[in-house]
Curated annotation (Swiss-Prot):
It holds the Pfam family RHH_1. Belongs to the YiiE family. The gene is yiiE. Residues 51-72 are annotated as: Disordered. GO terms for biological process: regulation of DNA-templated transcription. This is Uncharacterized protein YiiE. Signal peptide: none annotated.
């Protein structure tokens, strides 16, 4: 699978916690972040699908306060 680079701004506390987790799991920070993003996206998959057109008339669906637009 082709990979792209993404730059993140994280707090010092988040970096410290990420480094501890890296040590415990013996994997890279990138591997931990990839796994976390994949898990997050998987959890969001159902609400996004529902928001794209599966709603019942008058039903309100909140996907994520950070999700502004979903594109195919």
């Amino acid at each position: 699978m082709a990979m792209n680079t993404v730059f993140l701004h994280l707090s010092e506390e988040a970096i410290k916690r990420l480094n501890k987790l890296r040590g415990w799991r013996k994997v890279s920070r990138s591997a931990i972040l990839r796994e976390a993003v994949e898990q997050y996206l998987e959890r969001q998959q159902f609400p996004v699908r529902k928001a794209k057109g599966g709603r019942q008339r008058g039903e309100t669906v909140v996907v994520d306060d950070q999700c502004k637009e979903h594109k195919e």
